Design a protein with these regions (language model features):
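Secreted/periplasmic proteins that engage bacterial cell-wall peptidoglycan
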Residues: 2-133, 146-154
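Short proline/glycine-enriched turn/loop segments at secondary-structure junctions
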Residues: 136-143
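Short, charged low-complexity linker/loop segments at the C-terminal edge of domains
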Residues: 156-161
C-alpha cells in the first residue's frame, strides 16, 4: 500500500519544532501504509550519507548499512504507524556504538528544524522540542531505547511541507 498522509497537526507551544502526536484513537486511522517521504529523505541524507550540514561532524566510522525500522512499528496509533518514526539500531552498552548513537542524537537536536524532527530518544537521553523547554533530559529512565535511537518527525517534516 502506498504512503498516505494520516497526520493530525498539533498546536505549536513555543518549541523549535511543533510536536504532533496521536492520542487515544484507533490504530486503523493512523495507518499511513508506509514510511513517509520526509523520513525516507532524512534516512537517505543523514543516516545513509553525510548530511549537507555536517555539524556536529559525522563520525568516519559511521556504518554504511545500519539496521533501521520504520513503518509499521507495532501497528499501534503511534508515529511509526503514521510513517514518521524510525528506530536506528545502536547498542548503548557498546562504547563504539554508543558514540555513533550519541552523534546521531546530537545531530538531530542541533538540526531539528531542517527535517522537522520533534523528538529523539537514545539510552538515558530524551529530547522533544516542546518538552522541558526544548532541553535534553540527560536522565531519562524509559529503558527501552538501549538498543536503538528513536527519531520522530512532525507532520510537516513527514510530508515535506
Amino acid at each position: 500500500m502506498p504512503y498516505k498522509d494520516v497526520c493530525v497537526c498539533g498546536n505549536a507551544a513555543g518549541g523549535r519544532v511543533r510536536e504532533d502526536d496521536p492520542h487515544g484513537s484507533d490504530a486503523s486511522s493512523h495507518d499511513a501504509g508506509g514510511t513517509s517521504p520526509g523520513m525516507l529523505k532524512f534516512l537517505a541524507e543523514v543516516v545513509n550519507a553525510t548530511p549537507l550540514n555536517n555539524v556536529p561532524p559525522k563520525p568516519l566510522n559511521f556504518p554504511a548499512n545500519v539496521r533501521i525500522e520504520t513503518y509499521p512499528g507495532r501497528s499501534a496509533a503511534d508515529v511509526h504507524f503514521e510513517g514518521r518514526g524510525a528506530d536506528i539500531f545502536f547498542n548503548y552498552a557498546d562504547t563504539t556504538q554508543r558514540t555513533l548513537g550519541d552523534w546521531l542524537f546530537n545531530w538531530c537536536v542541533a538540526n531539528c528544524a531542517t527535517y522537522k524532527i520533534q523528538g529523539v530518544i537514545f539510552g538515558k537521553r530524551k529530547w522533544f522540542s516542546e518538552l522541558h523547554m526544548g532541553k535534553v533530559n540527560e536522565n531519562y529512565q524509559g529503558g527501552d531505547h538501549l538498543n536503538h535511537i528513536h527519531i520522530e518527525l512532525n507532520c510537516d517534516g513527514a510530508n515535506l511541507r
